[in-house]
């Protein structure tokens, strides 16, 4: 009996170690809708990004596959210097690869350079989207304050929220801005629709599989996006109330630039 126990103890220890490692691996992986840890990469000086982003003459970076199954984006600056961004979580043939190239090359979005991740499936918080849109539209600092019950004015993203609110691109809900809430697909489309000047929404939502889920306030924006080709069902799902992913935001901005151009709102 004692011999059996001596044999069983090492087996149990091995199982315990194995389970502990598995649980640790689970903790290290974030769900696509989890809060992204890239806040620090979005902290940028307002004056330094006033002219961020490209335009009709923008030259995108060169994409090359890397040994990790991801891709490298090599961006050439006006002075001829180059910088290579390595992403292990973006395959060169992914439906969002060109969009990632676009936002990285134009300086509109970034990734985690230390971990070499873009995190394409992660959701985008409202505060982060304010920073992204500020970069994309070439925003400039504004003196006008934005009064929200959940903002003190000391937040690193406050200047970008002020600009978004001042331009009428984003608002609050019940006196709060909800900076940590994830932006939905419909909400992202509404912001771009406003940036475009709320053009006449020609056409209908016929063929859009989630038309019944579109809110009354978002109908014109989604109709415009659907009929202009800003969103399609070829590459991913554009469910109105679903949290918009970083990959989807990159794609929206690339298509918007091709369709309308970047606006200095």
What are these regions (language model features)?
Residues 104, 165-166, 226:
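Alpha-helix C-terminal capping/helix-coil junction sites
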Residues 98-106:
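Mature N-terminal segment immediately following signal peptide/propeptide cleavage
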Residues 222:
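Catalytic cores of secreted/periplasmic or lumenal enzymes
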